[in-house]
């Protein structure tokens, strides 16, 4: 007897209300593919005679998404249940005499082997319908399937209609059926909506069609349906677990599988190590012994053997063997990195070809460029490839080097064995022949008296401190003493003219601080270590900031306030300058008492009158040193 033809119907007309989305449920992505695309690719491996997709809600979006697949669309104008959806096939299939596989479009994890086993079982036993069931630990929410010892279906009961005893049954209905179409076609017109949902149920057709048997799926995770975002996330986790388990069996290490992800289009060689927080997307091929991550994103790229990519992004590029990338590098599309190269921290490449044994270790932009072998790019080198209208190309020959903070304005041709001095800006199209040193920077210009011209806008100017003029006051405070009160007392008794803190260590049993942008005091009632104490001291008062750390290593800092009590000791070194006199005076700009600095001899540092403009002075024109000088 000839094998019956197989057709497939995928039910994809529903809105998916629980997804709370304008996008049809079946078009939500699970990894790189939509739910229905994943199912469709599995179904097409069965090579069905016809593949029918029932569409309804936002059907144009579904039709557009599946336009490249060999499917036929059947419209369900009103969504009146699964039975109603299959009724729409009656005029389409007509006199079809084969089997019809019916699957909901939101079951993306079915394996081809499972569907093939369902069809084969159906043809061996030859019932009117074979349904796919599963034994699960928690059947809540699913309709139950009741069978005899020969797996013949005795009854199908929806969850809401189950008695307490029936709810103990752990065999559930997956909603996947293989019907003999002529038998199904006879009962479809007789379905009714005599139920709470006022819908046509396909399960009613199963009950009416005749002999029905069940086949348990080996892995219940295959029949997980996606009805909301939570279930979408669960399905994604199952998909990831499948992929990672397969690659680990093939010799790939996932240091923390739960924190990494990849897609089916990724190809990993043995001894690849995937560090935590690393994600691979698109068509990727990774060579043996390469370590990816932690914290890296690889997209549609080919990476050779023995590479390490650390905290970096590589997109649509090709990386050679034994290449180090990162941390924090960005290899943008159309980059080609040769063998034994280094692309270091904060280096960005775009449409760049970099020859073997070349390095860009840090802080560089290499866009629209071709670098030879053994090229060294200094820190801060920028290839200025865009003129505001179009991109231009730069080529650098073998063994050439750029100094720190060099700018190469494209288009530019740099020969081999060229050294570009630090700080040079090379204009576009400037000739740089082989084996030359190029220096393209201006000579320094020194303008005496410059600070006087800006003093009025900078009211607090530091003054030179004559060597050996400081007076040093070391002191130790004892348990229970108040840190601020003792320092204020010392500033008054000495008295300190222009005091400040050189160093401070010790411990506190409690600390009182005024934190940034706060008006009240903050009390820390625990033992603390003094990390830093800084500020000024004078007879008018002290202005000190304190930083402390607790037993967990958490730090606190703010204005020193009364209530900072010594726990074991405080060892403090103060200094006083006899060359100046500090005081606290109202500042009209801030409204607070601020530091006023008065040299012992001379005018106050601030405020001071603005400088008078000098008359009849002409500036001598400077020489034009902007053009580069090449030294052959």
UniProtKB/Swiss-Prot annotation:
* Pfam families according to UniProt: Hexapep, NTP_transf_3, PCC
According to the record, the residues making up region (Disordered) are: 600-632
Q: Which residues form the active site?
A: 362
**Where does the chain cross the membrane?**
none
Record keywords: Acyltransferase, Cell shape, Cell wall biogenesis/degradation, Cytoplasm, Magnesium, Metal-binding, Multifunctional enzyme, Nucleotidyltransferase, Peptidoglycan synthesis, Repeat, Transferase
UniProt-listed Enzyme Commission number(s): 2.7.7.23, 2.3.1.157
The segments labelled Linker in the record are 230-250
What GO molecular function terms would the record report?
A: glucosamine-1-phosphate N-acetyltransferase activity; magnesium ion binding; structural constituent of carboxysome shell; UDP-N-acetylglucosamine diphosphorylase activity
Pathway participation: Nucleotide-sugar biosynthesis; UDP-N-acetyl-alpha-D-glucosamine biosynthesis; N-acetyl-alpha-D-glucosamine 1-phosphate from alpha-D-glucosamine 6-phosphate (route II): step 2/2; Nucleotide-sugar biosynthesis; UDP-N-acetyl-alpha-D-glucosamine biosynthesis; UDP-N-acetyl-alpha-D-glucosamine from N-acetyl-alpha-D-glucosamine 1-phosphate: step 1/1; Bacterial outer membrane biogenesis; LPS lipid A biosynthesis
Q: What is its subcellular localisation?
A: Cytoplasm
Q: Which GO terms describe its cellular component?
A: carboxysome; cytoplasm; membrane
Q: Which domain of life is it from?
A: Bacteria
| Predominant localisation class | cytoplasm
- The biased composition feature labelled Basic and acidic residues covers 621-632
Q: What GO terms describe the biological role, i.e. biological process, of this protein?
A: cell morphogenesis; cell wall organization; lipid A biosynthetic process; peptidoglycan biosynthetic process; regulation of cell shape; UDP-N-acetylglucosamine biosynthetic process
Region N-acetyltransferase: what ranges? 251-632
Q: Which cofactors does it use?
A: Mg(2+)
Q: What note does UniProt attach to the cofactor annotation?
A: Binds 1 Mg(2+) ion per subunit.
Residues reported to bind UDP-N-acetyl-alpha-D-glucosamine: 11-14, 25, 76, 81-82, 143, 158, 173, 227, 332, 350, 365, 376
- The residues that hold Mg(2+) are 106, 227
Chain segments carrying region Pyrophosphorylase? 1-229
Function text = Catalyzes the last two sequential reactions in the de novo biosynthetic pathway for UDP-N-acetylglucosamine (UDP-GlcNAc). The C-terminal domain catalyzes the transfer of acetyl group from acetyl coenzyme A to glucosamine-1-phosphate (GlcN-1-P) to produce N-acetylglucosamine-1-phosphate (GlcNAc-1-P), which is converted into UDP-GlcNAc by the transfer of uridine 5-monophosphate (from uridine 5-triphosphate), a reaction catalyzed by the N-terminal domain.
Self-association or partners: how does it assemble?
Homotrimer.
The text of the family note is:
In the N-terminal section; belongs to the N-acetylglucosamine-1-phosphate uridyltransferase family.
Protein name, entry field: Bifunctional protein GlmU
- Gene name, Swiss-Prot/TrEMBL: glmU
